[in-house]
UniProtKB/Swiss-Prot annotation:
Gene3D superfamilies xrefs: Leucine-rich Repeat Variant
Summary of the tissues where the protein is detected: Expressed in neurons and neurites of the CA1 and CA2 subregions of the hippocampus (at protein level). In adult brain, it is expressed in the neocortex, hippocampus and cerebellum as well as in the pineal gland and ependymal layer.
Modification Phosphoserine occurs at: 435, 501, 522-523, 527
Chief location: cytoplasm
GO MF term set: G-protein alpha-subunit binding; GTPase activator activity; guanyl-nucleotide exchange factor activity; protein folding chaperone
Designated gene of the protein: Ric8a
Gene Ontology CC entries for this record: cell cortex; cytoplasm; cytosol; membrane; plasma membrane
Taxonomic lineage: Eukaryota, Metazoa, Chordata, Craniata, Vertebrata
Keywords: Chaperone, Cytoplasm, Guanine-nucleotide releasing factor, Phosphoprotein
Any GO BP: cell migration involved in gastrulation
Keyword Aminoacyl-tRNA synthetase attached: no
Protein name per Swiss-Prot or TrEMBL: Chaperone Ric-8A
Modified residues (Phosphothreonine): 440, 442
Organism: Mus musculus (Mouse)
Function of the molecule: Chaperone that specifically binds and folds nascent G alpha proteins prior to G protein heterotrimer formation, promoting their stability and activity: folds GNAI1, GNAO1, GNA13 and GNAQ. Does not fold G(s) G-alpha proteins GNAS nor GNAL. Also acts as a guanine nucleotide exchange factor (GEF) for G alpha proteins by stimulating exchange of bound GDP for free GTP.
Length: 530
């Protein structure tokens, strides 16, 4: 049925005709997510009529039908202004049982009405900044959090739980104040950690299920997304022992999530949300990833269970096949693996054995090939600075932050970006908690080491001599041409001669010479003033 016909029926006020018109419209547009511009004014008129009835109170008998029509029209951005009013939002929140009230949450609400109201609110909060502001002012997050806390005691349908969590996700993603309110005032990390454990259906010390069912997967992903929003900056602050215990408890659940498969071909998506949240944990809490007890069939390395680290590495390999949004795909898992390797020697040695095995092929450039090392070295020169930074940082940590070892595996040309940023162009080693790991050279590498070009990281074929057959006068002429070309480029600021400062940073040649001379003068006792 057309919006104009439905609006005409509403204006007649005949209950049966109105109900039938709404039901017909709902059936026809249940899967409509885009709308015809030609009927825009008719839809706006219908929306205003619906709002007037909504604010006065919907008939209990046909409440679901009315809410379904509101839900469909709330997908249309041209109708948002009508629905995004304080009165409309309050009415929808009342039907969803999430208005702040002294009264307890009803024991047996109408779940169909509650669900439709939640869907309407999700649509409005997603698309309307006004609705976002009004929802925050109405403190809807308080009642939502209270209901999430009741999931263990009361039985709510899957869809109600899912849209509770979806609305929480939208509010925390779009409103900083709601994010802080849930994190601090409502103790959101503890609340949602308990909800995650309930959804996964396991205790931290038990083995994870083989497959997480589809509905539990959907709810778990929403919980992970809300937790990500509210813990986004928690890693930047120190945590006390009580908070550290909570984050470690959450870490054990995330460890389960990494190891479990998700139904409906959603495993990679599920693991992606898990890894994103792992990156928000305080660094000292990541030790839970290596705390899994050894059992038959587990992957042991240096007496430590590496099942979780191996699973994260396999996830990284999958993500490296992505061709778009590479930063979002690989940066979180690379950050987690980097911190695990930096803080735990067994993890670093295991990852190095997998990613940077002893060099045998010395005739292929480090970035060429399909090995994991080759793919990561290619990322070191990616256009996205964040992508190349995290890839280089990961490999640098696997090399125990040893500059010669880093250059050996990646080539000086690929390594130059990180070394310049760290002030390590002149070599050396930054301060770090690393033991002296052995880096055993293969026979092939030892034999070719003297012939390896440090810039490209491989043995180069000896190029022909371009001056072969030239007379001395011709050579001198070509040399002067080259000098003049460089001089012209330098004078026109196309290129700038660079040098190494005493601190190991690249700087202009003039500045580098000045710093060197200043350093020499300051260290020369004869240069002191009389």
């Amino acid at each position: 049925m057309e919006p104009r016909a439905v609006a005409d029926a509403l204006e007649t006020g005949e209950e049966d005709a109105v109900t039938e018109a709404l039901r017909s419209f709902n059936r026809e547009h249940s899967q409509s997510f885009t709308f015809d511009d030609a009927q825009q004014e008719d839809r706006k008129r219908l929306a205003k009529l619906l709002v007037s009835v909504l604010e006065q109170g919907l008939s209990p008998k046909h409440r679901v039908t009315w809410l379904q029509t509101i839900r469909i029209l709330s997908r249309d951005r041209s109708c948002l202004d009508s629905f995004a009013s304080r009165q409309s939002l309050h009415a929808l929140a009342c039907y969803a049982d999430i208005t702040v009230s002294e009264e307890p949450i009803p024991q047996s609400p109408d779940m169909d009405v509650l669900l439709e109201s939640l869907k309407c609110l999700c649509n409005l909060v997603l698309s309307s900044p006004t609705a976002q502001m009004l929802a925050a002012e109405a403190r809807l997050v308080v009642r939502l959090a209270e209901r999430v806390g009741l999931y263990r005691k009361r039985s709510y349908p899957h869809e109600v739980q899912f849209f509770d969590l979806r609305l929480l996700f939208l509010l925390t993603a779009l409103r900083t104040d709601v994010r802080q309110q849930l994190f601090q005032e409502l103790h959101g990390v503890r609340l949602l950690t308990d909800a995650l454990e309930l959804t996964l259906g396991v205790a931290p010390k038990e083995n994870p299920p083989v497959m997480l069912p589809a509905q539990e997967t959907e709810r778990a992903m929403e919980i992970l997304k809300v937790l990500f929003n509210i813990t986004f900056d928690s890693v930047k602050r120190e945590v006390d022992e009580e908070d550290a215990a909570l984050y470690r408890y959450l870490g054990t659940l995330l460890r389960h999530c990494v190891m479990v498969e998700a139904a409906g071909d959603r495993t990679e998506e599920f693991h992606g949300h898990t890894v994103n949240l792992l990156g928000n944990l305080p660094l000292k809490c990541l030790d839970v990833l290596l705390a899994l007890e050894l059992h038959e069939g587990s992957l042991e390395f240096m007496g430590v269970n590496m099942d979780v680290i191996s699973a994260l590495l396999a996830f990284l390999e999958k993500r490296l096949h992505q061709t778009h949004r590479l930063k979002e795909c690989v940066a979180p898992v690379l950050n987690v693996l980097t911190e695990c390797a930096r803080m735990h020697r067994p993890a670093r040695k295991f990852l190095k054995a997998q990613v940077l095995p002893p060099l045998r092929d010395v005739r292929t450039r480090p970035e060429v090939g399909d090995l994991l090392r080759n793919k990561l070295v290619r990322l070191m020169t990616h256009l996205d600075t964040d992508v190349k930074r995290v890839a280089a940082e990961f490999l640098f940590v696997l090399c125990s932050e040893s500059v010669p070892r880093f250059i050996k595996y990646t080539g000086y040309g690929n390594a130059a970006g990180l070394l310049a940023a760290r002030g390590l162009m002149a070599g050396g080693r930054p301060e770090g908690q690393y033991s002296e790991d052995e880096d055993t050279d293969t026979e092939e590498y030892r034999e070719a080491k003297a012939s390896i070009n440090p810039v490209t990281g491989r043995v180069e074929e000896k190029p022909p001599n371009p001056m072969e057959g030239m007379t001395e006068e011709q050579k001198e002429h070509e040399a002067m041409k080259l000098v003049n070309m460089f001089d012209k480029l330098s004078r026109h600021r196309v290129i700038q001669p660079m040098g190494m400062s005493p601190r190991g940073h690249l700087t202009s040649l003039q500045d580098a010479m000045c710093e060197t001379m200043e350093g020499q003068l300051s260290s020369d006792p004869d240069s002191d003033p009389d």
